[in-house]
């Protein structure tokens, strides 16, 4: 299988630089006249799969599936499989982070041969970047990607991410350590380790040497503006992967309306890969 960085670049070139989120919040299920049950969750996801099958990347928010227990995980497995069958890259927004054998177990679940394994997964480095090693190794072995939280847009994040250590912010250290992995594993091409930088972050870390993709959540309802993303953190053209969820999902449940809302956002960010 081709490495994740190359597959992501190819998907963006063919389908455009947008990641669409599947966030089945109970309020959204009710707004779509669906029950807040595993059956309602499944119906919500079926609609999203049909609407977003033509986009490059789709990002299910794992927490909303976990809330329904085993039945929710079954819906997530089915949704991941359906999206991948449609040629969509799936980014599982699980934000996993732990140490030792526990991290290795998370790695097996989200980046190994598990039915939950997607094309990429989000991860938290705040037990130390080195704690992610089992996940990074599993992802590399299975040609999957990892997006590591660096600078998030929630106000609380700044208390940790903008703290200084060894002359750099913690967010910059995360980016720099991800860059080391990318240089050591794929110096000639796009790496498989990306970072997450919120669209509303006022002082983003320097991304120019990352050598991997940058997931940029927070467009639309959360305040991020597509026209303001160019050159975020010194990113190169084609490096950014903007993500949107609520701005699009509130157009549902009609499949055509959902697809049109996602298309409008894609049109707004297409210049980033031009």
From Swiss-Prot:
Superkingdom of this protein's organism: Bacteria
Pathway it works in: Pyrimidine metabolism; UMP biosynthesis via de novo pathway; UMP from orotate: step 2/2
Enzyme Commission no: 4.1.1.23
Alphabetized UniProt keyword annotations: Decarboxylase, Lyase, Pyrimidine biosynthesis
CDD domains noted in UniProt: OMP_decarboxylase_like
Enzyme category, top tier: lyase
Keyword hit for Protein transport: no
Keyword Nucleus: no
Active site: 95 (proton donor)
Catalytic activity as recorded in UniProt: orotidine 5'-phosphate + H(+) = UMP + CO2
Pfam families given in the database record: OMPdecase
GO molecular function, one term: orotidine-5'-phosphate decarboxylase activity
Gene Ontology biological process terms, A to Z: 'de novo' pyrimidine nucleobase biosynthetic process; 'de novo' UMP biosynthetic process
SMART domains: OMPdecase
Entries under PANTHER family matching the protein: OROTIDINE 5'-PHOSPHATE DECARBOXYLASE
HAMAP family from the UniProt entry: OMPdecase_type2
Protein family per UniProt: Belongs to the OMP decarboxylase family. Type 2 subfamily.
Protein's name in the database: Orotidine 5'-phosphate decarboxylase
Gene: pyrF
């Amino acid at each position: 299988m081709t490495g994740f960085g190359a597959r992501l670049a190819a998907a963006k070139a063919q389908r455009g630089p947008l990641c669409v989120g599947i966030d089945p919040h109970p309020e959204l299920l009710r707004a779509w006249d669906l029950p807040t049950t595993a059956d309602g969750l499944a119906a919500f996801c079926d609609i999203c799969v049909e609407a977003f099958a033509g986009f490059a990347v789709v990002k299910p928010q794992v927490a909303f599936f976990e809330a329904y227990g085993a039945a929710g995980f079954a819906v997530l497995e089915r949704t991941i499989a359906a999206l991948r069958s449609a040629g969509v890259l799936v980014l599982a927004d699980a934000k996993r982070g732990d140490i030792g054998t526990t991290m290795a177990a998370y790695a097996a679940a989200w980046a190994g041969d598990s039915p939950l394994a997607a094309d990429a997964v989000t991860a938290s480095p705040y037990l130390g970047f080195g704690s992610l090693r089992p996940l990074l190794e599993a992802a590399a072995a299975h040609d999957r990607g990892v997006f590591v939280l660096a600078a998030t847009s929630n106000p609380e994040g700044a208390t940790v991410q903008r703290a200084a250590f060894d002359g750099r912010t913690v967010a910059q250290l995360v980016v720099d350590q991800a860059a080391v992995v990318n240089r050591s594993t794929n110096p000639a091409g796009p790496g498989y380790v990306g970072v997450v930088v919120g669209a509303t972050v006022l002082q983003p870390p320097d991304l120019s040497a990352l050598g991997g993709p940058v997931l940029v959540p927070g467009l639309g309802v959360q305040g991020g503006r597509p026209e303001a993303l160019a050159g975020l953190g010194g990113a190169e053209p084609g490096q950014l992967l903007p993500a949107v969820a609520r701005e699009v999902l509130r157009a549902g449940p009609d499949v055509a309306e959902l697809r049109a809302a996602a298309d409008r956002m894609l049109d707004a960010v297409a210049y980033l890969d031009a």
